[in-house]
Amino acid sequence: MEAVRPDSCERGTAAARAEERPAPEARAHFRVTRFIMEAGVKLGMQSIPIATACTIYHKFFCEINLDAYDLYLVAMSSLYLAGKVEEQHLRTRDIINVSHRYFNPGSEPLELDSRFWELRDSIVQCELLMLRVLRFQVSFQHPHKYLLHYLISLKNWLNRYSWQRTPISVTAWALLRDSYHGGLCLRFQAQHLAVAVLYLALQVYGVEVPAEGEAEKPWWQVFSDDLTKPIIDNIVSDLIQIYTMDTEIP
């Protein structure tokens, strides 16, 4: 087991943005986190447990070499562990069956044979390994509660017509969800991520916050005092890179 700390795991890094095309590691993690999200939905997981599963996965590979373990086994164990952390417990059998159908569409559930039990044991053993590698630090502060608060405040600032005619809320939640395809959850503070996805949603629809020009400081700094425009720009840049990968990866 080789411990590493990839540059992409450092807070606010510009390493990934320096490349015109995403690194192979980023593309691999994009595919696997897409699997985590789709499997999580099929398992009936709520948004916070899915976010926790993605964060556990990303954090594990901030400590471990990419080639050391099977990525999808780590993903399945991340789902299993996240269910425990967020008290939405999952059965290993359900995780295995959903994963099997993901890779083999239309197939029947696996028989309870030696192959099944070997995979189940691998998931459990991998979970224990992940807990040790992460030093049992598997509880995270997610941006979701901040985004909810910010959306309520923004709704009160904007006029009713602007709010109703543009899907700002839906877009901001979608941007936040998609941010977990990359390691933004580890590189940036939860409050900063929440403000940045809201900022981008407003930019997408050309919506301006009332009295912005007369205010002493930008609306986004009202939500987070230590947030700066360069941080927002970095988050937006990383989000754009994620959507670029989405168009390139089948």
Swiss-Prot record:
Q: Alphabetically, which GO biological process terms does the record hold?
A: positive regulation of MAPK cascade; regulation of cell cycle G2/M phase transition; regulation of transcription by RNA polymerase II
Q: Where is the composition biased (Basic and acidic residues)?
A: 1-10
Region named Disordered? 1-22
Q: Which UniProt keywords apply?
A: Acetylation, Cyclin
Any one GO MF annotation of this record: cyclin-dependent protein serine/threonine kinase regulator activity
SMART domains this protein is in?
CYCLIN (SM00385)
**Pfam families according to UniProt:** Cyclin_N
Q: Does the keyword Acetylation apply?
A: yes
Q: Which family does it belong to?
A: Belongs to the cyclin family. Cyclin-like FAM58 subfamily.
Purpose of the protein: Activating cyclin for the cyclin-associated kinase CDK10.
Q: What is this protein called?
A: Cyclin-Q
